[in-house]
Amino acid sequence: MTLVDRFLKYVSFDTQSDESTGLTPSTPKQMVFAEYLKTELESLGLEDITLDEHGYLFATLPANIDKKVPTIGFIAHMDTSPDMTGKDVTPRIVKGYDGTDIVLCAEENIILSPAQFPELLDHKGEDLIVTNGKTLLGADDKAGIAEIVSAIVYLKEHPEIKHGKIRIGFNPDEEIGEGAHKFDVGKFGCEWAYTMDGGEVGELEFENFNAAAAKITFKGRNVHPGYAKNKMINSIRVANQFIAMLPSTETPEQTEGYEGFYHLISIQGDVEQSTVSYIIRDHDRAKFEKRKEEIKRLVAQVNTEYGEGTATLELRDQYYNMREKIEPVMHIIDTAFAAMEAVGVKPNVKPIRGGTDGAQLSFKGLPCPNIFAGGLNFHGRYEFVPIQNMEKAMNVIVKIAELVASK
């Protein structure tokens, strides 16, 4: 089975996660895919294959050299985003992309166009795997899984490439921020690992957001609107007032690079009670803490104006910037950087404007930066992946294994 065949098979599994269930895996269909992968890894002759009740699949490619070298790992997630359906994915290969519009769905006039997605033009002449416009593709992160498995197959078929012990891990629920929650780092048994979960070719990431979630509930007082003067407190208006207090320029659509933000993700309510939910993000830990303090200050300000208990805050940290855990072991970044250069890929070290399982794993004792998997426009109908990107990612995995063994 080729890399492409493997990827096309993997995306046929619907593995959408769901944060509302409170289970791990959050959806049983992820376990169906995990069982398939387990069978495939068994057929490939890998060792120490385990699949636990939470959907964490681990396996080993034994070393083919006698000298002691570090055990390293490669990790990818099995779930796809809750943002769009991953059921009945029908991929299509556009061979030798010519730089023009790609019609994904003619009857609904869904078009993947370089006018809206100029990154398409970086892949003229390449072979693109696209959707039919009705689902996401699932390259996030089934491209990563296909690349890891294909790299392991390549190493098995080329014993002249010397490598140490390699562990691979496939986990559920990354898309809902829970992929690392039940990941047994001790059982995985690596000195370090890489998630294959980045986007464009060359991406190498060891900085991510510090992240928190805030839920603010506003209580109102409902009376007949005809007799409401000096009596009614409309919780919707109080919520709107709170929203307006936050800086309008510090939102996702107006920030980039290392700039943090407050992101209003939902608002629900009526006169009696309204709830707003935010995610808070910043790469800088001090600025991150300051953002949380600002939320607390504004909640207190609302209560000063309308009465204690009008606004209540639930605030929780979600994950932290892995940079502080990676900097003491920067040789793992140097190795990935060198591997990319060795296979003709220009490394692009950049901060992640998001989080990865690797960030949480790094704080659990497994340093775990992120490497490109090659897909673009994740989480929607315009997602695509150039086949050549996946091939390069696979080559990087092979080269990392070779470089670690050569030191």
From Swiss-Prot:
Q: Which is one Gene Ontology cellular component term of this protein?
A: cytosol
Positions annotated as active site in the UniProt record = D79, E174 (proton acceptor)
- Function text: Cleaves the N-terminal amino acid of tripeptides.
Subcellular localization(s) per the UniProt record: Cytoplasm
Q: GO:BP terms for this protein?
A: peptide catabolic process; proteolysis
Organism whose genome encodes this protein:
Bacteroides thetaiotaomicron (strain ATCC 29148 / DSM 2079 / JCM 5827 / CCUG 10774 / NCTC 10582 / VPI-5482 / E50)
Q: Which cofactors does the annotated protein need, by name? A: Zn(2+)
Task: Report residues binding Zn(2+) 2.
Answer: D140, E175, H379
The record, for InterPro entries, names:
ArgE/DapE_CS, Bact_exopeptidase_dim_dom, Peptidase_M20, Peptidase_M20_dimer, Peptidase_M20B
Residues annotated for Zn(2+) 1 binding in this entry: H77, D140, D197
- What's in the keyword line of the UniProt record? Aminopeptidase, Cytoplasm, Hydrolase, Metal-binding, Metalloprotease, Protease, Zinc
Q: Molecular function (GO) terms listed?
A: metallopeptidase activity; tripeptide aminopeptidase activity; zinc ion binding
Coarse class of the primary localization is cytoplasm
The enzyme's E.C. designation: 3.4.11.4
* Identification of the protein by name: Peptidase T
Q: How would you classify this enzyme at the top EC level?
A: hydrolase
> Which family would the database say this protein is a member of?
Belongs to the peptidase M20B family.
- Taxonomically, the superkingdom here is Bacteria
Q: Which residues form a coiled coil?
A: none
Give the reaction(s) catalysed: Release of the N-terminal residue from a tripeptide
Q: Would I find Cytoplasm among this entry's keywords?
A: yes
PROSITE patterns in the cross-refs: ARGE_DAPE_CPG2_1 (PS00758), ARGE_DAPE_CPG2_2 (PS00759)
Tell me the lineage of the source organism.
Answer: Bacteria, Pseudomonadati, Bacteroidota, Bacteroidia, Bacteroidales
